[in-house]
Structure formats: C-alpha cells, structure tokens
Amino acid sequence: MIIDTTAVQDMNSFSRLQSLKEVSGIIWMLVPILSLVLGITLGVLVIVWLEREISAGIQQRIGPEYAGPMGILQALADGIKLIFKENLLPSRGDTRLFSIGPSIAVISILLSYSVIPFSSHLVLSDLNIGVFLWIAVSSIAPIGLLMSGYGSNNKYSFLGGLRAAAQSISYEIPLTLCLLSISLLSNSSSTVDIVEAQSKYGLWGWNLWRQPIGFLVFLISSLAECERLPFDLPEAEEELVAGYQTEYSGIKFGLFYVASYLNLLVSSLFVTVLYLGGWNISISYIFVPGLFEITKVGRVFGTTIGIFTTLAKTYLFLFISITTRWTLPRLRMDQLLNLGWKFLLPISLGNLLLTTSSQLLSL
C-alpha cells in the first residue's frame, strides 16, 4: 500500500494547527483570570500599606518607611518572610482540617471577584445571579475558619471558629435582605445591570440616595462579615490569644491575613457597585453615556476611566473602614449578636417591605 507523503504532511499540519488553536484558546481564557489575580494582589498590597500609614497618622507615630519608598514594599517583605518560615502542625490536631482551612477561606473569597464589574467591558462573568453568588461563596469562608479552629485542637482556636460562624450567620441575613432591595429597584440581580440602572439619572440615580437605610445596614453588616474592629470577636487578642489563628505559622498564617484583606476589598467593591454607581462618573454634562463606544480607542479609554472611577470609590470606602478600625472599641459578643438579630435584621426587613411596596405602587 503506497501512502501519499503530501497527504500525510497535510494531515500533520492540520493536527498541529488544531493543537495551536487549542493552546491559544486556553491562553486567552487564562489571560483575564491571571490579570484579575494580579490586580487583586496589587490591591491587597496597597490596602496593607494604606492601613499602616493611616493607623500611624491616627496614633501620631511614624509608619513603615524602610522597605521601598515610603515603606510601600513592607507588605511584600512580610509576605516573603512568611513564605520561608517553618509550618508547624499541632501534634494532636486534625492535620487535614488544619491544612485545608486557610485555603478554603481564601479560595471562596477569590471566587467573588468573578462577578464584579470594574468597567462596562471588564467583568469576568456577568451572571444573572451575580450578587447572590457573592453571598453564596462568601458563606463558605466561615466554614474554613471553623475547620481551622477545630483542627488546631486548641480551645481558643475552636472558640474563635465558633464565633466566626455565629457572626457570619448573624450578619449575612441583613446583608441578603439589602441585596434583595437593590435587586427589586434594578429589576435584576446582575451586577452589570445594577450599575447601568444607576447610570440613567447621573449622580442622583445612585442607590445611596434611594436606599439610605439599606446602605447603612449594608455598611455595618459588611464590616462585620470582614471581622474588622469593632467586630473582630473571632480573633480578640485579650480573650482568645489570636482566635482560630493561634496555632498557625508560616504561609498558612499569612493566608488568613490575605483572606481578611481580600474580603475587605471585595466588600468595598460591592458597596461601590451596589450603592455608588460602579464605574460611572455620573457627570452627565461632561461624560455623555455611549461617548466612548464610537471607536476602539474610545472603548479602551472609557474602560480605563471606568476602572479608575471604580477604584477611587472603592478606596474611599476602604479609608472609612480603616479609620473605623482604629477609632472604635470592640463590642462584646452579646452586643454583637444583639445588634445583628434585634436591630439590623428588623431594619433590613422593613427596608425590603418599603422597597417592595414602592415598586408595586409604581406599576
């Protein structure tokens, strides 16, 4: 049997072309994901530096100044130090739960970034249930903290994990009710649709003015979800040494801090998206909607402006969160639970009923 060499070469060339197409498709799929991860990492480093500088200013002392200009590389130096430190395991603890707990906390929060629109053309996944995906995946993080506390075989760690679970349950319900109110106003649960619904009326179309009660409840609940002062009961130093982090060292110890700042950043981004108009500058006389959609260069320029606008609003909320941490005292556990169940839950439920009534009357 004689085989035509030309046909064989054509088949080999076709198979190589198909392989190259598959590889290029995988690369193009990974590029936005890796870009998002890189941007999030830089955002966390900036937040750590900002917190140290702001806390130094509030306490009238000198902040980080040796690692890089103005100490901006101090967080990177701390991360490298933790990578090379020894990872200790508790002798009588559950090593599997102990090891997997920090990873669950970080991964569950990272998934939330997939539905955040940084601009009209920069969102990893525009889902119809975007805001509720955030609630769903963020509720997994306390499970990781509880696993870490239980696997440590330490009473302080276990108590810290229990507090994290109780705090998460108490404040996720008001948070969800606020999200329902926003979804009713926007007639959608997609984060992109919510931002576009606010852009119709400029600055006065922000949900901040239409939902002031919901904004305050969302603000307090998001701070409690991030376990920031005055809501850092799961890791109260005076009572629980370091809570669920007590037995951790090395990179696993660093993962908890990364998860904390990731959660703070994603909460700030959702405040921007849900209440502050997202990527819209909201100056209708200067920036006409659709102005940057005419050419490719215009779309790139508009996307860049949208990213900077989103980040500016986000870091404004971050400044408020950091200032709150260094100015307010910690609540007791009973005060924390009473605030969530006796005050925020009825207020958020009443806000949802008012929103529903107004939407029905407007039909």
Curated annotation (Swiss-Prot):
<feature type="transmembrane region" description="Helical">
    <location>
        <begin position="203"/>
        <end position="223"/>
    </location>
</feature>
<protein>
    <recommendedName>
        <fullName>NAD(P)H-quinone oxidoreductase subunit 1, chloroplastic</fullName>
        <ecNumber>7.1.1.-</ecNumber>
    </recommendedName>
</protein>
<feature type="transmembrane region" description="Helical">
    <location>
        <begin position="248"/>
        <end position="268"/>
    </location>
</feature>
<feature type="transmembrane region" description="Helical">
    <location>
        <begin position="129"/>
        <end position="149"/>
    </location>
</feature>
<dbReference type="Pfam" id="PF00146">
    <property type="entry name" value="NADHdh"/>
</dbReference>
<keyword id="KW-0150">Chloroplast</keyword>
<dbReference type="GO" id="GO:0016655">
    <property type="term" value="F:oxidoreductase activity, acting on NAD(P)H, quinone or similar compound as acceptor"/>
</dbReference>
<dbReference type="GO" id="GO:0019684">
    <property type="term" value="P:photosynthesis, light reaction"/>
</dbReference>
<dbReference type="GO" id="GO:0009060">
    <property type="term" value="P:aerobic respiration"/>
</dbReference>
<feature type="transmembrane region" description="Helical">
    <location>
        <begin position="30"/>
        <end position="50"/>
    </location>
</feature>
<comment type="similarity">
    <text>Belongs to the complex I subunit 1 family.</text>
</comment>
<keyword id="KW-0934">Plastid</keyword>
<dbReference type="GO" id="GO:0009535">
    <property type="term" value="C:chloroplast thylakoid membrane"/>
</dbReference>
<feature type="transmembrane region" description="Helical">
    <location>
        <begin position="334"/>
        <end position="354"/>
    </location>
</feature>
<dbReference type="InterPro" id="IPR001694">
    <property type="entry name" value="NADH_UbQ_OxRdtase_su1/FPO"/>
</dbReference>
<comment type="function">
    <text>NDH shuttles electrons from NAD(P)H:plastoquinone, via FMN and iron-sulfur (Fe-S) centers, to quinones in the photosynthetic chain and possibly in a chloroplast respiratory chain. The immediate electron acceptor for the enzyme in this species is believed to be plastoquinone. Couples the redox reaction to proton translocation, and thus conserves the redox energy in a proton gradient.</text>
</comment>
<keyword id="KW-0521">NADP</keyword>
<comment type="subunit">
    <text>NDH is composed of at least 16 different subunits, 5 of which are encoded in the nucleus.</text>
</comment>
<keyword id="KW-1278">Translocase</keyword>
<feature type="transmembrane region" description="Helical">
    <location>
        <begin position="300"/>
        <end position="320"/>
    </location>
</feature>
<keyword id="KW-0812">Transmembrane</keyword>
<keyword id="KW-0472">Membrane</keyword>
<feature type="transmembrane region" description="Helical">
    <location>
        <begin position="165"/>
        <end position="185"/>
    </location>
</feature>
<keyword id="KW-0793">Thylakoid</keyword>
<dbReference type="InterPro" id="IPR018086">
    <property type="entry name" value="NADH_UbQ_OxRdtase_su1_CS"/>
</dbReference>
<keyword id="KW-0874">Quinone</keyword>
<feature type="transmembrane region" description="Helical">
    <location>
        <begin position="269"/>
        <end position="289"/>
    </location>
</feature>
<dbReference type="GO" id="GO:0048038">
    <property type="term" value="F:quinone binding"/>
</dbReference>
<keyword id="KW-0520">NAD</keyword>
<keyword id="KW-0618">Plastoquinone</keyword>
<keyword id="KW-1133">Transmembrane helix</keyword>
<dbReference type="GO" id="GO:0003954">
    <property type="term" value="F:NADH dehydrogenase activity"/>
</dbReference>
<feature type="transmembrane region" description="Helical">
    <location>
        <begin position="98"/>
        <end position="118"/>
    </location>
</feature>
